[in-house]
Protein backbone atom coordinates (compact mmCIF):
# COMPACT_ATOMS: atom_id res chain seq x y z
CA UNK A 1 0.00 0.00 0.00
CA UNK A 2 1.34 3.41 -0.96
CA UNK A 3 1.22 6.46 1.28
CA UNK A 4 1.42 10.19 0.67
CA UNK A 5 2.04 12.91 3.26
CA UNK A 6 0.55 16.34 2.57
CA UNK A 7 2.53 19.14 4.25
CA UNK A 8 0.84 22.54 4.31
CA UNK A 9 2.11 26.04 3.83
CA UNK A 10 2.01 28.61 6.56
CA UNK A 11 -1.36 30.24 6.00
CA UNK A 12 -3.71 27.50 4.86
CA UNK A 13 -4.05 23.91 5.95
CA UNK A 14 -3.59 20.70 4.01
CA UNK A 15 -7.00 21.02 2.38
CA UNK A 16 -6.22 24.21 0.45
CA UNK A 17 -6.95 23.60 -3.24
CA UNK A 18 -3.38 23.03 -4.51
CA UNK A 19 -2.61 20.55 -1.75
CA UNK A 20 -6.04 18.96 -1.74
CA UNK A 21 -5.98 18.12 -5.43
CA UNK A 22 -2.34 17.00 -5.42
CA UNK A 23 -3.19 14.66 -2.55
CA UNK A 24 -6.28 13.49 -4.41
CA UNK A 25 -4.08 12.47 -7.36
CA UNK A 26 -2.14 10.18 -5.01
CA UNK A 27 -5.34 8.89 -3.42
CA UNK A 28 -6.82 7.97 -6.81
CA UNK A 29 -3.71 5.87 -7.36
CA UNK A 30 -4.54 3.87 -4.25
CA UNK A 31 -2.47 5.78 -1.71
CA UNK A 32 -3.46 6.46 1.85
CA UNK A 33 -3.13 10.22 2.21
CA UNK A 34 -1.97 11.66 5.53
CA UNK A 35 -2.87 15.38 5.66
CA UNK A 36 -0.75 17.13 8.28
CA UNK A 37 -1.77 20.29 10.14
CA UNK A 38 0.78 22.32 12.08
CA UNK A 39 0.45 21.65 15.82
CA UNK A 40 1.85 24.99 16.94
CA UNK A 41 2.83 28.42 15.67
CA UNK A 42 5.88 28.23 13.46
CA UNK A 43 9.05 30.34 13.73
CA UNK A 44 9.90 32.99 11.16
CA UNK A 45 9.85 31.21 7.81
CA UNK A 46 12.97 32.97 6.51
CA UNK A 47 15.18 31.79 9.41
CA UNK A 48 17.22 28.58 9.11
CA UNK A 49 15.68 27.07 12.27
CA UNK A 50 12.41 26.68 10.37
CA UNK A 51 13.90 23.62 8.64
CA UNK A 52 14.40 21.74 11.92
CA UNK A 53 11.01 22.93 13.20
CA UNK A 54 9.30 21.47 10.11
CA UNK A 55 11.33 18.27 10.49
CA UNK A 56 10.17 18.03 14.11
CA UNK A 57 6.57 18.22 12.94
CA UNK A 58 6.84 15.92 9.92
CA UNK A 59 9.41 13.23 10.81
CA UNK A 60 7.23 11.67 13.55
CA UNK A 61 4.38 11.28 11.06
CA UNK A 62 6.64 9.74 8.43
CA UNK A 63 8.03 7.38 11.08
CA UNK A 64 4.54 5.89 11.54
CA UNK A 65 4.37 4.94 7.85
CA UNK A 66 5.99 1.81 6.50
CA UNK A 67 7.72 2.16 3.18
CA UNK A 68 8.66 5.33 1.33
CA UNK A 69 5.78 7.80 1.21
CA UNK A 70 5.39 10.48 -1.40
CA UNK A 71 5.76 13.93 0.16
CA UNK A 72 3.53 16.73 -1.13
CA UNK A 73 4.42 20.10 0.35
CA UNK A 74 3.63 23.74 -0.28
CA UNK A 75 5.67 26.81 0.61
CA UNK A 76 6.57 26.48 4.31
CA UNK A 77 6.13 22.72 3.94
CA UNK A 78 8.93 22.58 1.38
CA UNK A 79 11.31 22.89 4.32
CA UNK A 80 10.71 19.13 4.54
CA UNK A 81 12.97 18.77 1.49
CA UNK A 82 15.79 17.89 3.90
CA UNK A 83 13.78 14.90 5.16
CA UNK A 84 13.06 13.85 1.58
CA UNK A 85 16.78 14.05 0.78
CA UNK A 86 17.85 12.14 3.91
CA UNK A 87 15.30 9.36 3.38
CA UNK A 88 15.31 9.32 -0.43
CA UNK A 89 11.59 10.09 -0.67
CA UNK A 90 9.90 11.21 -3.89
CA UNK A 91 8.13 14.54 -3.63
CA UNK A 92 5.88 17.14 -5.17
CA UNK A 93 6.91 20.64 -4.05
CA UNK A 94 4.33 23.35 -4.72
CA UNK A 95 5.61 26.94 -4.64
CA UNK A 96 8.89 25.83 -3.04
CA UNK A 97 10.97 28.38 -1.18
CA UNK A 98 13.83 28.21 -3.68
CA UNK A 99 15.33 31.51 -2.55
CA UNK A 100 16.03 30.06 0.90
CA UNK A 101 19.48 28.46 0.65
CA UNK A 102 18.71 25.51 2.94
CA UNK A 103 15.69 24.52 0.84
CA UNK A 104 17.63 24.72 -2.43
CA UNK A 105 20.55 22.84 -0.83
CA UNK A 106 18.25 20.06 0.42
CA UNK A 107 16.71 19.73 -3.03
CA UNK A 108 20.19 19.52 -4.56
CA UNK A 109 21.00 16.60 -2.21
CA UNK A 110 17.88 14.65 -3.16
CA UNK A 111 18.34 11.28 -4.82
CA UNK A 112 14.64 10.53 -5.33
CA UNK A 113 12.75 12.35 -8.09
CA UNK A 114 10.69 15.44 -7.32
CA UNK A 115 8.38 17.85 -9.13
CA UNK A 116 8.73 21.60 -8.63
CA UNK A 117 5.73 23.86 -9.31
CA UNK A 118 5.92 27.65 -9.21
CA UNK A 119 5.07 30.89 -10.91
CA UNK A 120 7.14 33.65 -12.43
CA UNK A 121 5.46 36.31 -10.23
CA UNK A 122 6.35 34.47 -7.01
CA UNK A 123 9.23 36.16 -5.17
CA UNK A 124 10.46 32.87 -3.68
CA UNK A 125 10.46 31.02 -7.02
CA UNK A 126 13.49 30.93 -9.27
CA UNK A 127 12.87 29.10 -12.52
CA UNK A 128 16.57 28.77 -13.32
CA UNK A 129 17.26 27.11 -9.97
CA UNK A 130 14.21 24.87 -10.41
CA UNK A 131 15.33 23.66 -13.84
CA UNK A 132 18.85 23.05 -12.51
CA UNK A 133 17.51 20.95 -9.65
CA UNK A 134 14.96 18.76 -11.43
CA UNK A 135 13.86 17.71 -14.90
CA UNK A 136 10.29 17.80 -13.53
CA UNK A 137 9.21 21.46 -13.42
CA UNK A 138 5.95 23.28 -14.04
CA UNK A 139 6.51 27.03 -14.26
CA UNK A 140 3.39 29.14 -14.76
CA UNK A 141 3.88 32.52 -16.39
CA UNK A 142 2.54 35.32 -14.19
CA UNK A 143 1.51 33.08 -11.28
CA UNK A 144 2.11 34.37 -7.76
CA UNK A 145 2.80 32.39 -4.57
CA UNK A 146 -0.83 31.26 -4.41
CA UNK A 147 -0.63 30.26 -8.10
CA UNK A 148 -3.06 33.03 -8.99
CA UNK A 149 -2.56 34.70 -12.37
CA UNK A 150 -3.76 38.12 -13.52
CA UNK A 151 -7.16 38.30 -15.17
CA UNK A 152 -10.42 36.53 -14.48
CA UNK A 153 -10.49 34.10 -11.57
CA UNK A 154 -11.25 31.33 -14.03
CA UNK A 155 -7.71 31.75 -15.36
CA UNK A 156 -6.35 30.90 -11.91
CA UNK A 157 -8.70 27.94 -11.65
CA UNK A 158 -7.28 26.74 -14.98
CA UNK A 159 -3.80 26.91 -13.43
CA UNK A 160 -5.01 24.49 -10.76
CA UNK A 161 -5.97 22.01 -13.48
CA UNK A 162 -2.50 22.37 -15.04
CA UNK A 163 -0.95 21.58 -11.66
CA UNK A 164 -3.10 18.44 -11.35
CA UNK A 165 -1.99 17.30 -14.81
CA UNK A 166 1.66 18.01 -13.92
CA UNK A 167 1.36 15.91 -10.75
CA UNK A 168 -0.28 13.07 -12.69
CA UNK A 169 2.39 13.24 -15.41
CA UNK A 170 5.18 13.31 -12.82
CA UNK A 171 3.83 10.28 -10.96
CA UNK A 172 3.46 8.45 -14.29
CA UNK A 173 7.04 9.37 -15.26
CA UNK A 174 8.49 8.04 -12.00
CA UNK A 175 6.11 5.04 -11.89
CA UNK A 176 4.59 5.97 -8.52
CA UNK A 177 3.41 4.06 -6.73
CA UNK A 178 5.60 1.17 -7.71
CA UNK A 179 4.10 -2.30 -7.54
Language-model regions, residue ranges each:
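Serine-hydrolase catalytic machinery in alpha/beta-hydrolase-like enzymes
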Residues: 1-67
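Acidic beta-to-alpha connecting loop that harbors the catalytic carboxylate
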Residues: 10, 120-123, 143-144, 151-152
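Conserved alpha/beta-hydrolase "acid-adjacent" motif
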Residues: 15, 119, 123-129
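Catalytic histidine-centered segment of alpha/beta-hydrolase-like enzymes
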Residues: 45, 143-160
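Gly/Ala-rich beta-loop-alpha elbow adjacent to hydrolase catalytic centers
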Residues: 71-81
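Short, conserved loop/helix-junction motifs that constitute active-site signature segments
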Residues: 85-86, 105-111, 131-133
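A conserved short beta-strand
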Residues: 86-101
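Short beta-strand/loop motif that positions the catalytic acidic residue
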Residues: 110-111, 115-118, 122, 140
Amino acid sequence: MADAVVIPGGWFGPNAPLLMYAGDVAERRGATVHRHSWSQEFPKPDQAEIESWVAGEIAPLIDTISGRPLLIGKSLGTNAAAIAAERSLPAVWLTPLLTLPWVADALARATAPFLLVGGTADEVWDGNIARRLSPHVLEVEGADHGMYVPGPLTDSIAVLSHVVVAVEDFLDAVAWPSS
